[in-house]
C-alpha cells in the first residue's frame, strides 16, 4: 500500500510491481444542474479527478446510481449515464458496469480504477517549504450551483461553471507531470482552504496565499453577496478558521469564496520555485482553465494558512 486513507489523500494507491500501481477512488452526489446529460458529465469528471490528482490515468469505471424510478423516467437516467460514459471515454477509461438502487433522490457517480508508475505518484504529502502553489481551475462552483437551485444564477455564470465542472483534469495532470510536480490534490468538497490545509498538514508545512491571486468564476462575488452560500461552505469556513489567519481586510464574503465547496474543481499543485515557470507555461500550453500562482509554502505550524488580501505574491 503506497497511499491509504490516513493522510486524507484523494485516492488509494496500491503497488502491483516495480513498474505499476493501481489508483482506486469513488465519488457520487445529487444533481447540481438541471440537465441530466450535463449532470452525468460533471459527476464523472469529478470522480475521475482523484486519479489525476495522484498522477495517474483512469482505466476502468463502475457506475453508482440511485434513482427514483416511480418519479423520474428511465430515459432521463439514460441521459445521465450517457454523459458519464462519454466523459469516461474522453478520459480513455471504460465503464464496465455498476450498480443501481431505487432512491427517493437521484444520485450518480463512479468507482474509478487507474494506474500510475510507483515512482511518479503525486500526493498531498509532497509539498515542501519554498514551493509555489498553483491552481488549475477557478473556484466558485458551489456558490453558482446554489444559485442555480434558487433560479438566481445568470446565463454567464451557469455557462462558466458548467464549462469548469465538465472539464477533465487530464491536461493539468499532464502539465504537472512534465514539470516534475510531487505535491498535488484536487479541490473539491472541502473547498480551497480545506484541501490546502490537508495538504499542508500531510506535508508538515504551512503556507501563505493571496486572495486576489485566486481565480474565480464569473459573477461569484455578486452571488455570494446575495447569500447563495451552501451549508457545506459555511462548515468549511468554520473548520478552516481554526488553522487560518485572515488579513483583516478580507470580509466574510471573500472568506466564504475561499472555503466554497467545489464540484469537479481544479488541481492544487506544489511545485519548486525553479519549476514554477515551466509548470505555468505547460498549463497554458495544455489550455488549462487557470495557471495561477496563488501562494508559497513555508516552514511553520503544519497545516497553518495565512491569507493575504493582495493580488499577487510579493
Residue ranges and their predicted role:
Residues 12-23, 166-172, 237-248:
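Acidic-glycine-rich active-site phosphate/pyrophosphate-binding loop
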Residues 16-33, 38-41, 57-153, 192, ...:
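Glycine-rich anion-binding loops of enzyme active sites
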Residues 38-54:
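Alpha-helical scaffold segments that flank or form the walls of functional sites
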Residues 69-94, 101-108, 178, 185-314:
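Glycine-/charge-enriched secondary-structure boundary and capping motifs
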Amino acid at each position: 500500500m503506497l497511499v491509504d486513507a490516513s493522510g486524507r489523500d484523494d485516492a488509494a494507491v496500491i503497488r502491483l510491481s516495480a513498474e505499476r500501481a493501481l489508483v482506486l477512488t469513488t465519488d457520487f452526489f445529487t444533481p447540481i444542474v438541471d440537465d441530466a446529460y450535463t449532470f452525468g458529465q460533471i459527476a464523472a469528471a469529478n470522480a475521475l479527478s482523484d486519479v489525476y490528482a495522484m498522477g495517474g490515468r483512469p482505466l476502468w469505471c463502475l457506475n453508482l446510481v440511485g434513482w427514483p424510478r416511480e418519479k423520474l423516467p428511465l430515459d432521463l437516467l439514460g441521459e445521465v449515464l450517457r454523459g458519464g460514459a462519454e466523459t469516461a471515454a474522453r478520459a480513455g477509461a471504460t465503464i464496465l458496469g455498476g450498480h443501481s438502487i431505487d432512491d427517493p433522490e437521484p444520485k450518480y457517480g463512479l468507482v474509478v480504477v487507474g494506474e500510475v508508475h510507483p515512482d511518479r505518484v503525486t500526493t498531498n504529502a509532497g509539498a515542501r517549504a519554498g514551493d509555489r502553489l498553483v491552481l488549475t481551475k477557478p473556484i466558485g462552483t458551489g456558490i453558482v450551483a446554489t444559485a442555480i437551485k434558487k433560479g438566481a444564477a445568470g446565463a454567464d455564470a451557469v455557462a462558466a461553471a458548467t464549462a469548469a465542472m465538465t472539464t477533465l483534469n487530464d491536461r493539468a495532470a499532464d502539465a504537472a507531470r512534465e514539470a516534475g510536480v510531487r505535491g498535488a490534490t484536487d479541490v473539491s468538497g472541502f473547498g480551497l482552504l480545506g484541501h490546502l490545509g490537508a495538504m499542508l498538514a500531510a506535508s508538515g508545512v504551512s503556507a501563505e496565499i493571496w486572495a486576489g491571486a485566486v481565480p474565480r468564476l464569473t459573477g461569484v462575488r455578486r452571488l455570494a453577496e446575495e447569500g447563495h452560500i451552501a451549508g457545506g461552505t459555511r462548515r468549511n469556513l468554520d473548520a478552516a478558521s481554526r488553522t487560518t489567519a485572515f488579513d483583516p481586510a478580507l470580509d466574510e464574503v471573500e472568506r466564504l469564496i475561499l472555503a466554497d465547496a467545489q464540484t469537479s474543481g481544479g488541481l492544487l499543485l506544489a511545485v519548486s520555485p525553479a519549476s514554477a515557470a515551466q509548470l505555468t507555461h505547460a498549463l497554458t500550453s495544455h489550455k488549462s482553465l487557470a495557471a495561477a500562482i496563488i501562494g508559497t509554502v513555508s516552514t511553520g505550524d503544519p497545516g497553518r494558512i495565512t491569507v493575504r488580501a493582495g493580488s499577487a505574491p510579493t
